[in-house]
């Protein structure tokens, strides 16, 4: 045996060695497992064996066969088609939101909506609820043409192909720049033609956006004012319940009102009761039995005088402070079911289909008669700020009158049942809400400046009353068949904030406290229920308010 660098190399011909000419160091292998000759280790023993094993690990032998070539890279990239919703697999699973996180989430969503409205002019509510677009969503964003003549820009994400397409087809369907001209400049001649009409329109309409002094657009203002009160809690029970035996269950009557003097008037059969909001004392103002019964009540806007409509068609004015009648006015031939004040003018609607305007300072019983309705007038509401009167009747008609004109300014016939519930918004000019009866079951909101309907809400039950909040941009509705509930609505989103339950029959009557903090509801179950819904912003003093019955006031 020869020695080579401390390794013993066999010289026997029975041991076959495979040599590789490409290696600078030849490695000896024993390919004959049944050979009688074994490798002999020199006298250094185990040390050489360990050194050889380390040397073999450092210089592995070349393989006898070439490795097959593979088309795989050094990283694994999965192949997925475009229909795979990757965002669903990687979306963080949200746990239950704490009150703080919920408010933060609502604030973030509102800010995102506001920012989108300012940048893209989009106020679509669907974006608020789905911040991540799914692969099947088609998103369209358009920028309106400006006066510089730049044409519209349209960015569209196409619907991805189905899962049967291969990865090569996915690359072909990748969104690309549209082939149309992105920036298209008009010639000076065309530009003058296109801008002439716009300039004329701007000059004719002072309400254009370019004349606005607000840092945000009008659409964004509506979004800000329509902030949702999702976390708001409404009372589950009323804070006071009063028995009202004999409270009529007639849909066409108005037998409950809360005056600025903080006194609640309610008619039970032929008697009128006064409940003091300060001392909670109850007083009987008058008993009309047996000659007549009460069909409507309405407090004057300032002062302690109460208007009372009767079944015989007369209208009486009472001083609640002294419980004495000041005057009686005739004019109707049948019962008076609706009353409404506009300063010193009292308007009354009767079953004779007529509306009468009365100046309580003048000796005449009335000075104007409106005859547009074809059936009983059951709803009347003045907008004193704009001198507009809204009337609703059993002929399913809603009419808007300009001051004391004999013909209506607008006549809406969109309801399919009697219109008793009417209320004006104290926060926006010309916004009117109306509600229909059992066959209609809808609340409709109108823009009386344009004569158009803004919203149509299907409530699922008879709408008996509507009343706008003095403190917040919300309105209350009371319902009869089949829900018998009280609902609170947000405007302009017209979303339901909450529901008040407790009455077991139709909620036919509704009134609000003078400070706008509480409401009282009356139902055919002969109960009056008091609810605290709003926070009072200011305190009103009845002693400092002037009355239209003040002798120092002059007749205009």
Curated annotation (Swiss-Prot):
Impact when changing residue 177 to A: Increased mobility on Western blot
Q: Which residues carry this modification: Phosphothreonine?
A: 98, 177
Modifications made to the protein after synthesis: Phosphorylated by cdc2-cdc13-CDK complex. This targets srw1 for proteolysis which in turn promotes cdc13 turnover. Dephosphorylated during G1 arrest.
Q: Which SMART domains match?
A: WD40
Residues with Phosphoserine modification: 62, 187, 214
Keywords in alphabetical order: Cell cycle, Nucleus, Phosphoprotein, Repeat, WD repeat
GO molecular function list: anaphase-promoting complex binding; ubiquitin ligase activator activity
- InterPro entries assigned to the protein according to its UniProt record, in alphabetical order: Cdc20/Fizzy, WD40/YVTN_repeat-like_dom_sf, WD40_CDC20-Fz, WD40_repeat_CS, WD40_repeat_dom_sf, WD40_rpt
Outcome, altering residue 98 to A = Increased mobility on Western blot
Repeat as a keyword of this entry, yes or no, is: yes
* Gene3D superfamilies tied to this protein: YVTN repeat-like/Quinoprotein amine dehydrogenase
- Output compositional bias ranges, type Basic and acidic residues: 43-55, 69-78
Please state what the protein is called.
WD repeat-containing protein srw1
Q: Which organism is it from?
A: Schizosaccharomyces pombe (strain 972 / ATCC 24843) (Fission yeast)
Q: Which gene encodes it?
A: srw1
